[in-house]
């Protein structure tokens, strides 16, 4: 086919024409979305990423074009020339921006034919197996829903760049090939051909480089950065992800929080015309764990947790008493109107927490005649009213209680609280509840390795008033870290950084880095801190996760153009994949015979 014989440059897109253009001569190009034959006329819905336009092929007015249209099939690419005409009365489509007009086609050229697609591209409502969608991702993206999410992502990135530029931030790219440093997850490693036996690491974040930029005097930095983590995956994680990375000098956490809040407000308004109220709520890490059992609570509904150890200790219920003796935790929450839960429903929730490693779920209903449950007999009358008041129980309510180790109790109640909220439709998907979580512990205890580890990363500054606890009680030290949470998802985290070389050295030593390991992994950074480091702080926001929530998508893969599966594979290009033996020899790498094949 000689494509130069037909001028297929568009005069308009498929979402652009309105009734004001009636009688105009136009050229459109796109994909055949649907074809319909009606009484000799052929109707084609022509699609591009901008929208749909209806084409009309009339055998009397344009017999050649009509004859060619008889051959058209879904997903063929065509170009047409024609006249904009109004649709007949009663035939308009108010659901389409172009629904008042159609194009009477005079000329058509077929630019590209298509095999029959493995699934319908024209209908977003038809459920398609995700593996099939990912294998043919280039077809999946043509579906309107996926394309809209990618457009929203573009709008968000553009809004971020414009806003941060106006705030004096410089967009600076940092290296992709870097050094392997401990940041909490496994690194993706890249072998060096020039230096056999040595490896680069793909960045889990630009953390060290952005701090070096502050030492370099760049003052305010940002980057829409690709990051890589070889970690266990779930619906809101990918091995390759994008974050809005920021760092600034000579500021306070309050300054940075204000900038981030205004940035998010701008993104939501730009992308979805949503007005986000500011300032965001703030809760300490300790309050979050006490009232919600996690450090990323969903605040769109109630059901706060209550510590019941003091009341449980007054009962004769052995399950509670045994846990209290073992330094366990008895906690619960109240479900309004939950007294109508059937025994079957309660058993299902008991099984649910059982899968989280908790053996039982205690419950008490408040009815007109008082408290009702098989365990009420273990509760002395003297604490009934106290339980009712502390749990804010009204007639018709139910409370669920769990007794276990503090970590398991909190985890199970957090998951149960979220599940019940979903089951009872307590979550408004159109409501966005932001939260800053502050005052995290600086350290946590790694039971397996019997040592302290950083709760965030080792560059986070402690609260200066807690420095005296470094040697005596480091687990009580608070960090200057802050996470931002949206609807129960952590969408970002940051901190005030350590800008003093001696303090940074002490933190590394407290984390049990040997002098040799410290010099090998961080010697260059500790040296840089000795050359006049300004106070600085920063944050990284998860772009993929923000777009996932903004577009009300359950799966992060839906907002990434070419995502990996939950097994970190790409079904479309079939990777990871073997490489040629010659490449392995150059890298001096030996690999065992693989039993895996994509075929």
UniProtKB/Swiss-Prot annotation:
Main location as per UniProt: cytoplasm
Binding residues annotated for L-aspartate, in chain numbering: 183, 229, 456, 497
Site (described: Important for tRNA non-discrimination): 38, 90
Any Gene Ontology biological process: aspartyl-tRNA aminoacylation
InterPro entries (UniProt xref): Aa-tRNA-synt_II, aa-tRNA-synth_II, aa-tRNA-synth_II/BPL/LPL, Asp-tRNA-ligase_1, Asp-tRNA-ligase_1_N, Asp/Asn-tRNA-synth_IIb, AspRS_core, GAD-like_sf
Keywords: Aminoacyl-tRNA synthetase, ATP-binding, Cytoplasm, Ligase, Nucleotide-binding, Protein biosynthesis
EC number(s) from the headed UniProt entry: 6.1.1.23
Keyword Ligase recorded: yes
Residues holding ATP: 229-231, 238, 490, 542-545
Residue numbers spanned by region Aspartate: 207-210
PROSITE patterns registered for this protein in UniProt: AA_TRNA_LIGASE_II (PS50862)
Record localization: Cytoplasm
Pfam families: GAD, tRNA-synt_2, tRNA_anti-codon
NCBIfam families according to UniProt: aspS_bact (TIGR00459), PRK00476.1 (NF001750)
Family label: Belongs to the class-II aminoacyl-tRNA synthetase family. Type 1 subfamily.
UniProt subunit comment: Homodimer.
Function: Aspartyl-tRNA synthetase with relaxed tRNA specificity since it is able to aspartylate not only its cognate tRNA(Asp) but also tRNA(Asn). Reaction proceeds in two steps: L-aspartate is first activated by ATP to form Asp-AMP and then transferred to the acceptor end of tRNA(Asp/Asn).
Protein name, entry field: Aspartate--tRNA(Asp/Asn) ligase
Organism annotation: Protochlamydia amoebophila (strain UWE25)
